């Protein structure tokens, strides 16, 4: 990954895939495993000392009251606001919460960082502050 970055390449990684195996005796056997993509993405971003962590998902923005009549999309959140909303249970435990947790862990590990959550289609707009949810 560092080699690709040093060659000015955009690296898209930590998307899961692969077949987990474990050694049993002299054989490799399939193993049940889940790769938490959001967590791994955040860890990689910390390891390479990235300035921005972008998490791509199927919604353009993080929302409060998601799926309800009073749903409120957020274009920006502070770390403190994200923590507060997480404590209030605003984020689905198997959908948005892991993304928020990964973003918060990344942001707290360095200075002058931001995390962006959006869709692949809006990624370029999000980098330019015109789409998605930015957490700083």
What residues fall within each predicted segment?
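C-terminal catalytic "cap/lid" subdomain
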Residues: 1-136
């Amino acid at each position: 990954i560092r080699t690709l970055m040093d060659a000015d390449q955009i690296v898209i990684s930590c998307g899961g895939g692969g077949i987990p195996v474990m050694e049993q005796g002299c054989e490799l056997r399939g193993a049940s495993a889940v790769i938490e993509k959001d967590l791994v993405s955040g860890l990689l971003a910390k390891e390479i000392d990235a300035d921005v962590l972008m998490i791509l998902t199927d919604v353009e923005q993080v929302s409060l009251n998601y799926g309800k009549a009073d749903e409120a999309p957020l274009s920006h959140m502070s770390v403190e606001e994200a923590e507060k909303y997480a404590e209030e249970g605003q984020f689905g435990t198997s959908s948005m919460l892991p993304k928020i947790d990964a973003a918060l862990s990344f942001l707290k590990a360095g200075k002058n960082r931001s995390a962006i959550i959006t869709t692949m289609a809006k990624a370029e707009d999000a980098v330019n502050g015109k789409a998605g949810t930015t957490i700083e």
